[in-house]
């Protein structure tokens, strides 16, 4: 084997160890019987998983996360679907500029976006925290929704839509009856990806929490400031399983290669 090939293999192995090593440690720690983060565990137990569901603060935080993620995903889809359709069907010079504008929430640091929402929406406009949080999550979801749906629409020839219109369909009916059925998998993948992004968000959400209103990642962050037991490790395992499950669904519906298409 050439020296360069050996170096490449070792580099890849180091990257995998660096990325997956902490996840392996956390996963094993979640099944620890002890109240301390021992690795490897001396005795295995599901004790900390049961404790999660017995804890009102974690259950309440998950319910808030679920509500905000679903509401934000719905709003992002209502904005992103027509925007993606318009961008995919136009060849105007301003197309790239508008697409870049919709991608700006990804470019702007989350802490900047979160602080801006706190100052100008929650404080200045006196909008309640939960609504402001949902708006913030909708903003960070929109780029993912647009990106996925634009990629999905690139596989739908405009000719079939024009044929439907020539046969008597209105533009709206052609969109609903011809275009939407052909991009159902793309819409599903966009919503799931947006949901994952929202569920795991910390930088934006940390500025928008308040008394009785906090999401699961923020609650986990607050918990580890005072406690050092494996409860958060167990929660991390559950979140990883949820994320992996959703990514498998996305892969089975569209394929993850859609996210790399231009």
Where are these regions (language model features)?
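Transmembrane alpha-helices
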Residues: 16-23, 146-149, 157, 171-200
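Short membrane-interfacial helix/loop motifs at transmembrane-helix boundaries
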Residues: 21-56, 209-211, 262
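Membrane-interfacial helix termini and adjacent extracytoplasmic/periplasmic loops
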Residues: 37, 41, 46, 111-140, ...
């Amino acid at each position: 084997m050439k020296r360069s090939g050996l170096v490449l293999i070792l580099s890849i192995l180091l990257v995998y160890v660096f990325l997956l090593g902490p996840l392996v440690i956390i996963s094993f720690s979640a099944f620890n019987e002890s109240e301390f983060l021992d690795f490897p565990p001396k005795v295995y137990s599901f004790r900390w998983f049961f404790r999660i569901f017995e804890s009102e603060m974690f259950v309440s935080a998950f319910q808030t996360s679920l509500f905000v993620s679903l509401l934000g995903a719905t709003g992002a889809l209502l904005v992103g679907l027509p925007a993606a359709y318009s961008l995919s069907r136009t060849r105007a010079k301003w197309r790239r500029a508008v697409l870049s504008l919709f991608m700006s929430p990804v470019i702007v640091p989350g802490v900047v976006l979160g602080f801006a929402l706190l100052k100008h929406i929650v404080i200045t406009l006196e909008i309640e925290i939960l609504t402001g949080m949902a708006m913030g999550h909708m903003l960070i979801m929109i780029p993912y929704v647009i990106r996925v749906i634009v990629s999905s629409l690139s596989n739908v020839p405009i000719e079939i839509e024009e044929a439907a219109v020539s046969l008597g369909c209105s533009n709206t009916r052609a969109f609903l009856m011809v275009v939407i059925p052909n991009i159902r998998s793309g819409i599903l993948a966009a919503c799931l990806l947006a949901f994952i992004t929202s569920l795991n968000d910390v930088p934006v959400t940390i500025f928008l929490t308040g008394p009785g209103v906090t999401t699961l990642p923020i609650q986990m962050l607050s918990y580890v400031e005072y406690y050092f037991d494996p409860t958060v490790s167990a929660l991390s395992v559950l979140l990883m399983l949820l994320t992996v499950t959703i990514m498998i669904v996305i892969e089975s519906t569209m394929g993850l290669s859609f996210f790399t298409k231009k």
